[in-house]
Regions:
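FAD-dinucleotide binding site
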Residues: 3-4, 12-16, 23-469
Length: 469
């Protein structure tokens, strides 16, 4: 879960321990490690490369885009750095990246956007505080009911099936049902897990442990962290990898400017890229791994960022709003980012089915127009023209093909283990979608990078960490 908008019972997870122990479960390579090519300069690839480089290995990173960071992308929006991909360090107390950010001297601030301050429906109008609090309770209880719903509906049920069954049993008024469902389905499930609800597996939703300590935002953007970790590395940009050939002698990685030989390759490209088949493997990946890749998928969280000259949304200050327009799932989540950005800024989040269809059919102008129309609905008044806007396209970007992984109906966390398993002791895999318990997050990508470096023999990652003061 990348966007942790819901207060849940806290389950401690000592991810920090992974910094010391990760890699122990995967057998060490039997071939000597002489040169490693890392495919992808996102958090997983940069972390692995940093650790290998610090340990004295020869390592080269090939990155398809003309920038590093991958799904971390801090953009200067009219003089203000805004994160268009990952924005939150989830669970400050358990998140290993908080220690890394501390050690590098970055400033991060608490940013728990759990509260929905405003909710409105195009049909029912605005909801009051009592109704919002009740809907929050109704939505939250769904997660406590998951074991019973799974027993009732079976292993092939989707989250949409679960939500239908849950609300069928609650004798709520139509108005309370509308808001309760929007709180659960739009605000939590489609913005956290972000895939269309009929595709999300009921069995595996909400099985990722919540990290303790609340969420934080890095002032100046997440990009700084990845830039800092990448310092001094041999990174080749605009190198689209198209083919990986491996045999007993080593690997050859083919990309835009030619071919590079190495003893090992680490692929950190998103599952969406592996599914698309734009990287050929010779010989083909084992049937079991290809089948796992086919079963897994990426979700579709997208953002529209609205920057204004003046701040005019007092009722949303440091908070969030939930919109139910007349189009199902259309841009439901509004988040005030003004204090973190240092300028009047709203981030509009949307995911699920709506994101898939809107990304395929609407242009940027239309997406901004929909975001502004829904903002007017939320505030109940007209709004000025933004001074700057930014629209993301993670879903259609050929180098991400979605936002982050989720477990679809018919898949299971074991598929991520299968994806992670090395092939022929030459081809290694890392990235957020290769470790279920921390999947869909930046710290998951980071830990996967640490893990693969350790598997290749790195004893110390050389990545500094310091406690919060
Ligand atoms: C909108 C959005 C919001 C998010 N919010 C949060 C959040 O608040 N908190 C959080 O923890 N996580 C969040 N995430 C998830 C987080 O961004 C990812 O889990 C994490 O950044 C993934 O890192 P990675 O290294 O595994 O993959 P990536 O960052 O995707 O890196 C893979 C790299 O491979 C490159 N690549 C792809 N194909 C090729 C090729 N053929 N040849 C060479 N290179 C290639 C890509 O360009 C990319 O740079 C969010 C993601 C999105 C999209």
């Amino acid at each position: 879960m990348a966007y942790d908008a819901r207060m849940r019972s806290l389950l401690a997870l000592s991810v920090v321990a992974c910094l010391a122990a990760c890699g122990g479960g995967t057998p060490r390579p039997t071939h000597p490690v002489t040169r490693v090519v890392v495919v992808g300069a996102g958090m997983a690839g940069i972390t692995a490369a940093h650790a290998l480089d610090a340990a004295g290995y020869d390592v080269v990173v090939l990155e398809a885009r003309d920038r590093i960071g991958g799904r971390i992308h801090t953009v200067d929006l009219a003089g203000v750095p805004i994160d268009m991909g990952a924005a939150w360090l989830h669970g400050a107390r358990d998140n290993p990246l908080v220690g890394v950010a501390n050690a590098y001297g970055f400033t991060h601030v608490a940013d728990d956007v759990d509260d929905v301050a405003l909710a409105v429906s195009a049909v029912e109008g605005p909801f009051d505080d009592r109704e919002i609090a009740d809907a929050f309770t109704v939505a939250d209880r769904f997660f406590g009911r998951l074991p019973a719903l799974r027993r009732q509906l079976g292993p092939e049920a989707s989250v949409a099936d679960g939500s239908d069954a849950y609300f069928a049993d609650l004798a709520l008024t139509p108005r309370a049902t509308l808001l309760g469902r929007a709180m659960l389905e739009r605000s939590y499930l489609e913005l956290d897990y972000a895939a269309p609800l009929p595709l999300q597996s009921l069995r595996w939703v909400d099985e990722d442990p919540t990290l303790r300590g609340g969420d934080r935002i890095l002032l100046g953007g997440y990009g700084q962290l990845v830039e800092r970790l990448a310092e001094g590395l041999d990174i080749r940009l605009s190198e689209v990898v198209t083919r990986v050939v491996y045999d007993d002698q080593g690997v050859t990685v083919h990309s835009t400017s030619g071919a590079m030989s190495a003893s090992h390759v680490i692929l950190t490209v998103p599952i969406g890229v592996l599914r698309a088949g734009t990287i050929a493997f010779e010989p083909p990946l084992p049937e079991e791994k290809s089948a796992a890749i086919e079963r897994l998928d990426l979700a579709n969280l997208e953002k529209v960022v609205l920057r204004f000259e003046t701040f005019f949304w007092d009722e949303l200050e440091d908070n969030s709003g939930l919109v139910m327009s007349d189009v199902d799932g259309e841009m439901p989540g509004y988040y005030d980012l003004t204090s973190e950005a240092g300028a009047p800024t709203l981030v509009v989040l949307y995911g699920g089915d709506y994101a898939r269809s809107a990304q395929a059919t609407l242009n940027d102008e239309e997406l901004v127009a929909r975001a502004l129309a829904n903002l007017e609905l939320l505030l109940g008044r007209s709004v000025p023209t933004p001074s700057a806007t930014y629209v993301t396209h993670w879903t259609t970007d050929p180098f991400s093909r979605g936002s982050y992984s989720f477990i679809p109906v018919g898949a299971s966390p074991a598929d991520m283990d299968t994806l992670r398993a090395p092939v022929a002791d030459r081809v290694f895999f890392a990235g957020e979608g290769t470790r279920f318990r921390t999947s869909s997050t930046v710290h998951g990508a980071f830990l996967s990078g640490v893990e693969v470096a350790r598997t290749l023999g790195v004893a110390s990652t050389g990545i500094p960490t310091a406690p919060s003061r």
